[in-house]
Amino acid sequence: MPDLHRLALSALQYRPVGAQSGNASSAAASCTGDYMAGDSSLERDCGRLADGCSFPQVRGSATGVSDQSLGGSIHFSNAGRDEYVVELGRLLDLTDGVAQPKKLFDLLSAFAFKFGCKWLAYGPLTSDHKALNRVKCDSEEILNYPDGWRERCLEMGYETIAPVIKESRMGAGPIRWSDMYSDASTTEYERRMFDEAAMFGLRSGITVPLRGPRGSCAIMSFARHCEREFHDRTIAYLQLAATHFHLRVAKIANLNAVQKIPALSLREKECVLWVARGKSSWDIGVIMRISENTVNFHIKNVMRKLGTSSRTVAAIKAISLGIIEL
């Protein structure tokens, strides 16, 4: 937790650029949910986000504004910067001890919502061309994208061609969707995916590649209803929160895996170890100075606990689970 706090403090060193004229001022009045130093009411922020940012699609936007362009319109005080740290610290405190991924996702969603991000999606990053295998916990998916957009993705196969997925596999940092849209390597079909996402309300977003223990790889996407670029500072905080979430989920998965490993007695471990070394029940009995029947009794218990029908398979499974070592 202290490491994340230090990273959060370093993220505050960024200072917004000067004011821009024109549409930036009017946009600031309608879509300021990204700055906690302004209106602290989440409900009012969301109202502006929903009512004030009704851009039709990503392509060809001449009036799009960024967090940087709003820097001159909104006075981001030191107290406001401190509030970012407070909110991140609150997220870390609230997630401490939580053992349900869906609950962790709900807490992360509430945190991201304060940055104007209504939509989130998390899932493992596979090595093949299947982009995002939806993670399920208690029969619920760890994403809150609109149902219509999820159905459209499945219908069109967008989950397998998303350019942010390809970029994430390269080990890049946070990816702005707008950058991928304008990238020369992005095809028209892939741009169409972004255009259609905007029609369903996902008008701007970022995707964060995540790395965890034992090589676990995942991605987390944050999307806004408002067509406005993400400030570098905002991305830094969302990346910290997403990384914390991923590490917590990975830890829970590891704990669950450990809990599912059957507990064998010392005698059972010793018997199955000798089975793995090719010894018969009679041989094991001589080595352990117990009867052959007692050896068979222990081996049958091992087979039952490991859910196998053969002693050889039981030995192999015991090795793979780390119960015994040759």
From Swiss-Prot:
Protein origin, superkingdom: Bacteria
One biological process term in Gene Ontology: regulation of DNA-templated transcription
Alphabetized UniProt keyword annotations: DNA-binding, Plasmid, Transcription, Transcription regulation
InterPro entries named in the record: Sig_transdc_resp-reg_C-effctor, TF_LuxR_autoind-bd_dom, TF_LuxR_autoind-bd_dom_sf, Tscrpt_reg_LuxR_C, WH-like_DNA-bd_sf
DNA-binding residue intervals: 281-300
Record-level Gene Ontology MF annotations: DNA binding
Keyword presence, Protein biosynthesis: no
Span of domain HTH luxR-type: 257-322
Matching PROSITE patterns: HTH_LUXR_1, HTH_LUXR_2
Family from the record: Belongs to the autoinducer-regulated transcriptional regulatory protein family.
Protein's name according to its UniProt entry: Putative HTH-type transcriptional regulator y4qH
Organism: Sinorhizobium fredii (strain NBRC 101917 / NGR234)
